[in-house]
Amino acid sequence: MTDVTLKALAAERQVSVDRLVQQFADAGIRKSADDSVSAQEKQTLLAHLNREAVSGPDKLTLQRKTRSTLNIPGTGGKSKSVQIEVRKKRIFVKRDPQEAERLAAEEQAQREAEEQARREAEEQAKREAQQKAEREAAEQAKREAAEKAKREAAEKDKVSNQQTDDMTKTAQAEKARRENEAAELKRKAEEEARRKLEEEARRVAEEARRMAEENKWTATPEPVEDTSDYHVTTSQHARQAEDENDREVEGGRGRGRNAKAARPAKKGKHAESKADREEARAAVRGGKGGKRKGSSLQQGFQKPAQAVNRDVVIGETITVGELANKMAVKGSQVIKAMMKLGAMATINQVIDQETAQLVAEEMGHKVILRRENELEEAVMSDRDTGAAAEPRAPVVTIMGHVDHGKTSLLDYIRSTKVASGEAGGITQHIGAYHVETDNGMITFLDTPGHAAFTSMRARGAQATDIVVLVVAADDGVMPQTIEAIQHAKAAGVPVVVAVNKIDKPEADPDRVKNELSQYGILPEEWGGESQFVHVSAKAGTGIDELLDAILLQAEVLELKAVRKGMASGAVIESFLDKGRGPVATVLVREGTLHKGDIVLCGFEYGRVRAMRNELGQEVLEAGPSIPVEILGLSGVPAAGDEVTVVRDEKKAREVALYRQGKFREVKLARQQKSKLENMFANMTEGEVHEVNIVLKADVQGSVEAISDSLLKLSTDEVKVKIIGSGVGGITETDATLAAASNAILVGFNVRADASARKVIESESLDLRYYSVIYNLIDEVKAAMSGMLSPELKQQIIGLAEVRDVFKSPKFGAIAGCMVTEGTIKRHNPIRVLRDNVVIYEGELESLRRFKDDVNEVRNGMECGIGVKNYNDVRVGDMIEVFEIIEIQRTIA
């Protein structure tokens, strides 16, 4: 057998390692968990375990149960039976002979030890008794000797006492005389002290009586009903008797106190202390209790006459209750002040800094605004940015209307086929690329042109230096072209106009110039500042001139940036990759971004684990105006967030968490307030249909664009509600949320995973996949149109003129009519018109032609018409027959 480790042996025997180590120790072998065990040691352990198993005691267990019933007498003469079960258990152990011999030897040794101890105790007691007897005999001899000496001394004293008796009698007489004189002096001193104490007590009593009289007249008079104490009955005679009894008791107390004060004081110090106590009591009570009845309780604290103005420190958000505590006023007063200012709030509602400042200043306090982002400012300022600025490449954003050729133009510049990769041939993300030309490097941002991507275009305009406005020569200025011009003007960015599709026969560049001039984009030949370049992305004409125009504009701008030091930039786009996690496309503005840097990006932070350029190649660093994809963030940042490299990851995490908390607080503080204009909307809120949507997309910008577009579809009757949105595939959580809220699951360029598909199948959820935003918006419009209540329209189908009126015993007045227009149908709603004024609206009850009931009468025929519940039909009236049709409404 080969050696094995103790841990493996424990696993083989299915026992714990500690127990196996203990068994080896019991067998006399010291082992640890990692030691090896030989075959000999295994045999030793096995023999030890067998000995233990053989030598183990045999046990015999006897159990016995007895059951009985006990009758317990209860209330009402009824008895209750209780079942009692007694269980007994005895265990007999059969020991082996060796153990029995060992126990017998131990018992024998114990008995011998007890016998030896008993004998030693008896001998010790005998010795102690003998010693005690000897001590008592010695003491008896001493006592006898002392008594003998005492008798001899008494006989000698008897003789001497007779000689001194005469001298003692004379001394005692002298001593008695001195004691009598001292007693007389002491008695006189006590009488003088008592007389002084009595005079002092009378003076104090007189003073107390006088003060009681003054308080009686100066105290606030109380009502007659309240002068008496508590009564135990409501009878008037009984209450009077109680009052009389109270007065007698009070008078007796007063007399008792006065008598005590007038009694002679006892002798010594006790008399003085007693007199002092009586004097103090008399001063407090004031005679017969007059002062107690006349006094009234008064509050010692005086309320300040004027309000106290405080310095109130207010953060970015604060609750109404906290603001009230800082101003040392009640919360209701703060709420009243807010209502006077036109804002309604509860005591636990969070208000923003501006509102709190207005309320505090309205209540007369001085406000100190506190900045809570000191840590954030410290982290952002602790950066290396002291290097000299160097020229950098321009960042160019290509903007324009959808399908005007923006991506195709950039595609020709980069000599790649990017447009074919976009769904439907339209751009739905910001594409960031940098291109090396003969005259230098240019960074391009390609933005979507669809109407839904307004915020994405606005971000592109803010992050750029130059805007290239692409306008199709055959199409002219379109809505998104105007919007791109507005974004460029808002960002203060120069515009270079690229008139595309110049190779088409219907191209009209002059028309483009005229239309753009209406929006403030004037060509240089007209005295403006914008360069116009005629290009064709398909044929490649004018591309070099466009690049030269861009570089010329960049030279005029003198673009510079710090190349060394810690980088900063902006998030162009972000998405969640299933294999790589959160990925952000970052455009570096200044500094150099290195792999391994700690970045703070909006609400997220992290260390750059990897960087890739637009071609998917790994790079180690990125300088100014270079777009890169970075991995390693804690979450998906929002597009447009600032990216900053910081020194400390712990501080970056604190700042990110602080930003998340403040964003939530500010969002709660700025929620919809209860204003008058919202009350009517809230009243009709229950009548509004809702289309709930859970939206997942591949990138953050698409989520933003689709959410904005869908929310704009809402009407007064049907509202779109985005229950949840995010970046990445559809997960089980999204499916559960959609099932709970009865929502439609929408995936834009993403798919559901296996667990989500199971939930979708089991719950029969509506799951839609899209890759083009047009289709998504159209289908949501169709779903909303199905929720609209149909429109009811009245369509006139016939008109009849009353020529004569007949009387019928069954129907009343019957109008003999001639059908002048359309068809008259039975049981249709009608109107009776007199002089083109509606005088009755009801139902056509009877329609006859030649005494036969018919269902309809056509134009040019005569008929008899009976109007239900109406008899005032006259000759010359017009009867108008109509029907109500439903028209399905659609979302515009």
From Swiss-Prot:
Keywords: Cytoplasm, GTP-binding, Initiation factor, Nucleotide-binding, Protein biosynthesis. Pfam families: EF-G_D2, GTP_EFTU, GTP_EFTU_D2, IF-2, IF2_assoc, IF2_N. Residues 93-304 are annotated as: Disordered. Residues 254-269 have a biased composition (Basic residues). Residues 446-449 are annotated as: G3. HAMAP family: IF_2_B. This is Translation initiation factor IF-2. It comes from Salmonella gallinarum (strain 287/91 / NCTC 13346). The lineage of its organism: Bacteria, Pseudomonadati, Pseudomonadota, Gammaproteobacteria, Enterobacterales.
